[in-house]
Curated annotation (Swiss-Prot):
Organism: Homo sapiens
Highest taxon above the source species: Eukaryota
Name of protein: Glypican-4
Modified residues (Phosphoserine): 357
Subcellular compartments: Cell membrane
Alphabetical keyword list: Cell membrane, Deafness, Disease variant, Glycoprotein, GPI-anchor, Heparan sulfate, Intellectual disability, Lipoprotein, Membrane, Phosphoprotein, Proteoglycan, Secreted, Signal
Membrane-related topology note: Lipid-anchor; GPI-anchor
GO biological process, one term: regulation of signal transduction
Pathological association: Keipert syndrome: An X-linked recessive syndrome characterized by craniofacial and digital abnormalities. Clinical features include a prominent forehead, a flat midface, hypertelorism, a broad nose, downturned corners of mouth, and widening of all distal phalanges. Additional variable features are cognitive impairment and sensorineural deafness.
């Protein structure tokens, strides 16, 4: 009996110790779950102090659990908020980049026009004095139309510039022939000879080509920046589906219900869930990358032959050169006009002398070359501005296909990619064995974590794809120097959230997008929950002791 009693006593003590340890660990783990639950602003009465039966759980694994039904429901809502927060940080950064660059470019362009107009006005006042003041509305109208084209569009630049030179010819023709009286009909006839006579030399043709190409490229580029920011803003409003929400809950908080509060989701597990929840956003990537490439093409034009700064900065000198050319060739031009339109009627003698005295044309029309050019617009140059935007555009490529990986790279969402064994796989603390699915809606049919209806693409995403496609076409036209018409992007891409998340909040200072796809490891079966629980340890020890006692009795 003594031999039998001692082992029995030792086994009994071991079982009791293991049971006490298991109870203590369970209590401790549930206490930590409760503390974290309350720290999120939830009612502590929802959280049990000790493990309870988990038959009430709908999404998280059942069995012994630290979560009540109320906790699971609130964790479900919290997981959606956590998802929105992390995705919005990624999206807001991109949105802020485009918004800030559009603002800089817009300010630069408008200030460039203001500087050019001021420079022309100052130069012409010094050069032509009263004659310019009498005709200044002609030049004001020119800049009004240029500004209107940039802000509103709906201006035919070629027709507008042709009209400017025709009106300038009428004014100049009167001045160089101030001894004659010209009716409106006669001046209209004079305008018809503008192309044939070329009274301003080759300046109108060259300037029209330069202005049209530069303005089209500049406005299209600015509109592209605005469209890009608008697309990001609309696409990035998160509205996860019910299936996505279930997967998010299981990934982020179901580990808490098992008491594993410090164990983060496996990286590939997170990747599958993000690719399922952001499936529609992945379909943007192809058209987005085409759009970025088209923007970069136009940027090259802005740095080269379509540089609007090099066109607008000397526009006063170019127009003045045209005026001087008209003055130098006024006799030949007048003779040809008189031949085509007929001889004009002379003014009375008194009015002739007074008109010549008032114009003082020959004495006042002298070229003027200001020593100081206009100050740099918006405190920068177009070259520096375009260089900066090009860098940001290159960094923005593959943004949508990289978004799931970048969300999982956030330490709040998943364990590191190298920590494959000590992570939460949706059932327990163990390696995640499923392969990572591809990006985009079509690849989600075999997603092991999120059930996605691949037959129903998001309507808002389709609208953004079309908006990008249209804008890309306009970029290519601008690259070739062709004028373009603009649609209202706010109407074309309107709609509520699509299921991808971004609300305008604080953004990181620089891009940090990872375009590398992380492939998971394939397997034929799911990973079961791992890590032996304290309760299981006590149970195994008890069984072992009972078997030992039975065998010892048989030996006796």
């Amino acid at each position: 009996m003594a031999r039998f009693g001692l082992p029995a006593l030792l086994c009994t003590l071991a079982v009791l110790s293991a049971a006490l340890l298991a109870a203590e660990l369970k209590s401790k783990s549930c206490s930590e779950v409760r503390r974290l639950y309350v720290s999120k602003g939830f009612n502590k009465n929802d959280a049990p102090l000790h493990e309870i039966n988990g038959d009430h759980l709908k999404i998280c694994p059942q069995g012994s659990t630290c979560c009540s039904q109320e906790m699971e429901e609130k964790y479900s809502l919290q997981s959606k908020d956590d998802f929105k927060s992390v995705v919005s940080e990624q999206c807001n950064h991109l949105q802020a980049v485009f918004a800030s660059r559009y603002k800089k470019f817009d300010e630069f362009f408008k200030e460039l026009l203001e500087n050019a107009e001021k420079s022309l006005n100052d130069m012409f006042v010094k050069t032509y004095g009263h004659l310019y003041m009498q005709n200044s509305e002609l030049f004001k109208d020119l800049f009004v139309e240029l500004k209107r084209y940039y802000v509103v569009g709906n201006v035919n630049l070629e027709e507008m510039l042709n009209d400017f030179w025709a009106r300038l010819l009428e004014r100049m023709f009167r001045l160089v022939n101030s001894q004659y009286h010209f009716t409106d009909e006669y001046l209209e006839c004079v305008s018809k000879y503008t192309e044939q006579l070329k009274p301003f030399g080759d300046v109108p043709r060259k300037l029209k080509l330069q202005v049209t190409r530069a303005f089209v490229a500049a406005r299209t580029f600015a509109q592209g920046l605005a469209v890009a920011g608008d697309v990001v803003s609309k696409v990035s409003v998160v509205n996860p589906t019910a299936q996505c929400t279930h997967a998010l809950l299981k990934m982020i908080y179901c580990s808490h219900c098992r008491g594993l509060v410090t164990v983060k989701p496996c990286y590939n597990y997170c990747s599958n869930i993000m690719r399922g929840c952001l499936a529609n956003q992945g379909d943007l990537d192809f058209e987005w990358n085409n759009f970025i490439d088209a923007m970069l093409m136009v940027a090259e034009r802005l740095e080269g032959p379509f540089n609007i700064e090099s066109v607008m900065d000397p526009i006063d000198v170019k127009i003045s050169d045209a005026i001087m050319n008209m003055q130098d060739n006024s006799v030949q031009v007048s003779q040809k006009v008189f031949q085509g339109c007929g001889p004009p009627k002379p003014l009375p003698a008194g009015r002739i002398s007074r008109s010549i005295s008032e114009s003082a044309f020959s004495a006042r029309f002298r070229p003027h070359h200001p020593e100081e050019r206009p100050t740099t617009a918006a405190g920068t140059s177009l070259d520096r501005l375009v260089t900066d935007v090009k860098e940001k555009l290159k960094q923005a490529k593959k943004f949508w296909s990289s978004l799931p990986s970048n969300v999982c790279n956030d330490e709040r969402m998943a364990a590191g990619n190298g920590n494959e064994d000590d992570c939460w796989n949706g059932k327990g603390k163990s390696r995640y064995l499923f392969a990572v699915t591809g990006n985009g809606l079509a690849n989600q049919g075999n997603n092991p974590e999120v059930q996605v209806d691949t037959s129903k693409p998001d309507i808002l995403i389709l609208r953004q794809i079309m908006a990008l496609r249209v804008m890309t076409s306009k970029m290519k036209n601008a690259y070739n120097g062709n004028d373009v018409d603009f649609f209202d992007i706010s109407d074309e891409s309107s709609g509520e959230g699509s299921g991808s998340g971004c609300e305008y909040q604080q953004c990181p200072s620089e891009f940090d997008y990872n375009a590398t796809d992380h492939a998971g490891k394939s397997a034929n079966e799911k990973a079961d929950s791992a890590g032996v629980r304290p309760g299981a340890q006590a149970y195994l020890l008890t069984v072992f002791c009972i078997l030992f006692l039975v065998m010892q009795r048989e030996w006796r």
